[in-house]
Amino acid sequence: MDNQQRRTDNMASGETDHLQCVEEPQPGDLIEIFRPAYQHWALYLGDGYIINLTPVDEGQATAVSSVKSVFSRKAVVRMQLLKEVVGADSYRINNKYDDDHTPLPVSEIIQRAQMLIGQEVSYDLLGSNCEHFVTLLRYGEGVSEQASRAIGAISLVTAAASAFSVLGLINTRSRNRPF
C-alpha cells in the first residue's frame, strides 16, 4: 500500500491528530509528534528508529518536549528510537505533502538521512525547522506549513500594530489642531 493510500485509510477510519499511530511506519515516512505547544517532525528510518533535529545542548534523551528546542539556533541531527522521542506524547504518520511533491526513492531518502547523523546544523523556527529538515530529506525541498502559519500570524500582528499606530498618530494630530 502506498503512502497516499495509507494516509487516506487513516483519515477514513477516523484517526485524528491526537491519537497514537496504530500502523507501523515505513522507511521514509514523515512522523508528526504532537508536543504541548507545537508539532515536532521526524523521518522514519526503519526498525523503530527515526532521524530528527534536537537542540545542541539537549543531549541524547529527547523525550522531554522542551519549548527551548523551538527557540534554539543550532541543532544536532540524531538517530533515535521513535518511542523514546515520542515519550508520553502522541504521533501520526503524516506524508501530507505527497500530493504536491514527489517523494524521492526510499533508498535515497535513507542514504541522505544517514549521512547527516551527528552533524550540527543551523536551526530557525521560520526558515529551517524540524519540518523543513525532514521534508528536505523526503522530497528534496524543505517545506513547513507550521512555519507558514507562524509567519502569517506574525504578519497579522505586525499589520494590526501598524494600523493602531497610524490611527493613534491621526487621532493625536487632529487633537493638536488649533481650529
Curated annotation (Swiss-Prot):
Extract one GO BP annotation from the record: lens fiber cell differentiation
Species the sequence originates in: Danio rerio (Zebrafish)
Q: Which tissues is this chain's protein expressed in?
A: Expressed in the eye lens.
Q: Where is the active site?
A: H40, C130
TM segment ranges: 150-170
Q: Which UniProt keywords apply?
A: Cytoplasm, Endoplasmic reticulum, Hydrolase, Lipid degradation, Lipid metabolism, Lysosome, Membrane, Mitochondrion, Transferase, Transmembrane, Transmembrane helix
In a knockout, what does one observe? Answer: Knockout animals exhibit normal growth of their body and eye lens. However, the disappearance of mitochondria and the endoplasmic reticulum in the lens is almost completely suppressed and membranous structures persisted in the lens central region.
InterPro entries per the UniProt record, alphabetical? H-rev107_PLA/AT (IPR051496), LRAT_dom (IPR007053)
The catalytic activity, as recorded, is: a 1,2-diacyl-sn-glycero-3-phosphocholine + H2O = a 1-acyl-sn-glycero-3-phosphocholine + a fatty acid + H(+); a 1,2-diacyl-sn-glycero-3-phosphocholine + H2O = a 2-acyl-sn-glycero-3-phosphocholine + a fatty acid + H(+); 1,2-dihexadecanoyl-sn-glycero-3-phosphocholine + H2O = 2-hexadecanoyl-sn-glycero-3-phosphocholine + hexadecanoate + H(+); 1,2-dihexadecanoyl-sn-glycero-3-phosphocholine + H2O = 1-hexadecanoyl-sn-glycero-3-phosphocholine + hexadecanoate + H(+)
Q: What is this protein called?
A: Phospholipase A and acyltransferase 1
- The record places the following residue ranges in the Cytoplasmic compartment, namely 1-149
Name of one Pfam family that matches? LRAT
For the LRAT domain, which residue ranges apply?
Answer: 30-146
Q: Name one GO cellular component term.
A: mitochondrion
Segments on the Lumenal side according to the record's topology features? 171-179
Q: Outline what the protein does.
A: Exhibits both phospholipase A1/2 and acyltransferase activities. Shows phospholipase A1 (PLA1) and A2 (PLA2) activity, catalyzing the calcium-independent release of fatty acids from the sn-1 or sn-2 position of glycerophospholipids. Shows O-acyltransferase activity, catalyzing the transfer of a fatty acyl group from glycerophospholipid to the hydroxyl group of lysophospholipid.
